[in-house]
UniProtKB/Swiss-Prot annotation:
Domain of life: Bacteria
Location of the protein in the cell: Cytoplasm
CDD domains: RRF (cd00520)
Pfam families in UniProt: RRF (PF01765)
Molecular function GO terms recorded: ribosomal large subunit binding
Protein's recorded name: Ribosome-recycling factor
Function per UniProt: Responsible for the release of ribosomes from messenger RNA at the termination of protein biosynthesis. May increase the efficiency of translation by recycling ribosomes from one round of translation to another.
Main location: cytoplasm
S-S pairs: none
Upper lineage: Bacteria, Pseudomonadati, Pseudomonadota, Alphaproteobacteria, Hyphomicrobiales
Organism expressing this protein natively: Afipia carboxidovorans (strain ATCC 49405 / DSM 1227 / KCTC 32145 / OM5) (Oligotropha carboxidovorans)
Residue stretches spanning the membrane: none
């Protein structure tokens, strides 16, 4: 629905951006099981710039508690190893030629609870972002030259989209929380 300056699809797109950002952040949280997404935030100093790990190596999960990083260029092995160590993921690389193996240690109960708190913090940041988008939409509706009925309808539609986005965020959080707490 587009009326003057108000576009519900633009608001949906911006809210989807907040959800995608949350999905990315949660993907970087370690759960005790190996997942390729754990290494997504790792940036490697390569060829004079910072590059995502997946642009200089192939990451695979040969075992449930093991990540394997196959570096394409032999000269980049040390840089990839350094990037993994500096990523604060708590992983210790074991290098064999061009293959770097990362054993995923068991998470203790205290660490699991810390990770759940971090996940909640990420989810709250996403909810705040969605609420900001809602506020922006409501501001546009108020400033638009709409009848009172149109303003009510637009405000209701904005609230529906907001509620759906927050429900999606809560679902993502619940899934990640269950994943973290499963021993």
């Amino acid at each position: 629905m587009t009326t003057n300056g108000f576009d519900i699809n633009d608001l949906k797109r911006r809210m989807d951006g907040a959800k995608e950002s949350l999905r990315y952040e949660l993907g970087g949280l370690r759960t005790g099981r190996a997942a390729i997404s754990m290494l997504e935030p790792v940036q490697v100093e390569a060829y004079g710039s910072h590059m995502p790990l997946n642009q200089v190596a192939t990451v695979s999960v040969p075992e449930p508690r093991l990540l394997s990083v196959q570096v394409w260029d032999k000269s980049m092995v040390k840089a990839v190893e350094t990037a993994i160590v500096n990523s604060n993921l708590g992983l210790n690389p074991a290098t064999e030629g061009q293959v770097i193996r990362l054993r995923i240690p068991e998470l203790n109960e205290e660490r699991r609870k810390e990770l759940v708190k971090v996940a909640h913090k990420y989810a709250e940041a996403a909810r705040v972002a969605v609420r900001h988008v809602r506020r922006d939409g409501l501001d546009i509706v108020k400033k638009d030259k709409m009848s009172e009925d149109e303003q009510e309808r637009a405000s209701g539609e904005i609230q529906k989209v907001t509620d759906a986005a927050i429900a999606d965020i809560d679902k993502l959080l619940a899934t990640k929380e269950k994943e973290i707490l499963t021993v």
